[in-house]
Amino acid sequence: MGPLWLDVAGYELSAEDREILQHPTVGGVILFGRNYHDNQQLLALNKAIRQAAKRPILIGVDQEGGRVQRFREGFSRIPPAQYYARAENGVELAEQGGWLMAAELIAHDVDLSFAPVLDMGFACKAIGNRAFGEDVQTVLKHSSAFLRGMKAVGMATTGKHFPGHGAVIADSHLETPYDERETIAQDMAIFRAQIEAGVLDAMMPAHVVYPHYDAQPASGSSYWLKQVLREELGFKGIVFSDDLSMEGAAVMGGPVERSHQALVAGCDMILICNKREAAVEVLDNLPIMEVPQAEALLKKQQFSYSELKRLERWQQASANMQRLIEQFSE
């Protein structure tokens, strides 16, 4: 499979989608709420994606919970990460949440949810209650449980947004945030611990500039991705860029320049979402390359949604998540 992830417009593939999915540079499709009507339609779409690609291809979605849950009707509601630490049995619930989220996606032939968020703190507009907590131990304890749940059902895990997006106020979807702190050791401690525990299969860096360390956003910085992530922390998994269509990546130039910089800096795979012209421009200008190691991220199990829903574990987890949402929703 190639390094580029892109999106498709609707419930079914167009002729253009089918043609693009055969391009050797394409390695993944990221789905959005607009791609989901009901359970059977989603299964049919994912089957069509795999057939059109004619080779292994990754299918992913942002389904972490709370406001970032693309598939809702017909799926269990997953709470924002912040809620787990507020509950008495929060660690147990976080593991159930990770398992439930991953299991329901696998039952619909989705390989990945880009989760969990390992950022610390609730102040950032882009993160807010997507974070598990405001201190290292709270984030570590609850994210570790969520990761255990995902792995138990056979979904690869993605830590984000390295080396920490939680301390900036600005939203990297809309602008490039600058983290002016002289040290981000506390934020880094979370990523370091999860890498050492061997529970992260992939990593997604932040479109954030940390000027005391490097002038480039982490997503396009060889300092962060090669020197720190690979060499210092010893991370061996896949590195995804965050969506290169986000304004946070604009300092790296146009679509081709952003893609080239991210790949040269150390990203293995790059995402270009909601801008088909930009994705095609990148396909036309990037040299063809393979990312065979990314096949390790394909889902590890196969089962139907009806089989899943018959499990007592599913019934219990789904009910518990709904109760948690009702308990803490404002």
From Swiss-Prot:
Coiled coil: none annotated. One of its GO terms (molecular function) is beta-N-acetylglucosaminidase activity. Gene3D superfamilies: Glycoside hydrolase, family 3, N-terminal domain (3.20.20.300). Keywords: Antibiotic resistance, Cell cycle, Cell division, Cell shape, Cell wall biogenesis/degradation, Cytoplasm, Glycosidase, Hydrolase, Peptidoglycan synthesis. GO terms for cellular component: cytosol. Its main location: cytoplasm. It is an enzyme of class 3 (hydrolase). The keyword Ribosomal protein does not apply. InterPro entries: Beta_hexosaminidase_bac, Glyco_hydro_3_AS, Glyco_hydro_3_N, Glyco_hydro_3_N_sf, Glycoside_hydrolase_SF, NagZ_Beta-hexosaminidase. Pathway: Cell wall biogenesis; peptidoglycan recycling. This is Beta-hexosaminidase.
